A protein has these predicted regions:
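General beta-strand recognition
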Residues: 35-37, 99, 127-129, 214, ...
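N-terminal helix-turn-helix
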Residues: 1-27
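Polybasic (Lys/Arg-rich)
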Residues: 167-259
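A short alpha-helical element within helix-turn-helix/winged-helix DNA-binding domains
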Residues: 1-3, 119, 241
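A structural signal for short hydrophobic beta-strand segments in well-ordered beta-sheet cores
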Residues: 27, 119, 147, 205-206
Length: 259
């Protein structure tokens, strides 16, 4: 039905084909009940681009129908650098290297030719995972000053997975920090925040009382992960490993000196 009227089969099939093309979602019909269903629901997994696109377009549709209250919908600023996203996506599709002008915080700008392997959205910023010819490097799109396609081809190894590359890390900061089994204690309302928005795919709830909840993680505790823990203030306490607990104490002590 559409606005109370029957939807022509040809229109339905066009919509179904468009959904398949845009989201990779297959809509099949059960010959016994004549009911339609999604035959590959796994594509809507939590980390899939299909789920992200679906959620984004759903929100877009809701807001488009709510122009009358646009002044009552408060959004975050769109991060800089998104104007380069289209060129990067085209380069990934075509397996073409890109030439970019990049400027790190507090440094001079420079030009670099890299092979674009993947893009990642993290905390409202887009990042490019690339290979320089010698090593992997991650670049923030909001620190790119210029970007263009080159005529130079590249080939990403068939066994390389961007998801696997980032799997052991909290965000986009990747280094040789050793893997660790981390146990934290969440106080007050913090456990509810962690349950509804886990910090990492390895997060597990291992103990719960009336006063606190313990969570475990298996990842590389890079600086951005520690910063995330600190952002919860006294709501999070690191229990294990002991060296990480000591490091957190030192970071808190240094921060305390500023006050």
């Amino acid at each position: 039905m559409a606005d109370g009227n029957a939807l022509p089969r040809s229109s339905f099939n066009r919509h179904r084909d468009a959904i398949l093309d845009m989201f990779g979602i297959i809509i099949d019909c059960d010959p016994k009940t004549y009911c339609y269903y999604i035959s590959n629901p796994e594509v809507l997994g939590d980390d899939s681009i299909e789920r992200w696109l679906f959620s984004t377009l759903t929100v877009h549709g809701v807001l488009s129908d709510s122009v009358a209250i646009k002044g009552r919908v408060v959004l975050e600023n769109v991060p800089a650098g998104v104007e380069f996203l289209d060129t990067i996506i085209r380069a990934i599709k075509m397996n073409k290297k890109i030439l970019m002008t990049y400027q790190r915080f507090g440094a001079e700008s420079y030009e670099k030719v890299v092979a674009p392997y993947a893009v990642k959205l993290f905390h409202q910023r887009w990042y490019l995972l690339s290979h320089t010819g010698h090593h992997f490097a991650t670049y923030a799109l909001d620190r790119m000053l210029a970007l263009s396609l080159t005529d130079e081809d590249f080939e990403m190894p068939a066994d390389f997975s961007p998801q696997a590359y980032f799997a052991e890390y909290f965000g986009v900061l990747t280094d040789d920090t050793p893997m660790a089994h981390i146990v934290i204690r969440a106080h007050n309302w913090t456990p509810n925040y962690l349950r509804t928005l886990p910090l990492h795919t390895s997060q597990h709830e291992i103990a719960t009382t009336d006063h606190y909840t313990d969570f475990s993680f298996d990842l590389r505790p890079t600086a951005d992960f520690l910063g995330q823990l600190l952002s919860h203030g006294d709501g999070i306490e690191v229990l294990e490993p002991t060296d990480l607990r000591q490091k957190m104490k030192e970071m808190i002590a240094e921060n305390f000196k500023r006050y």
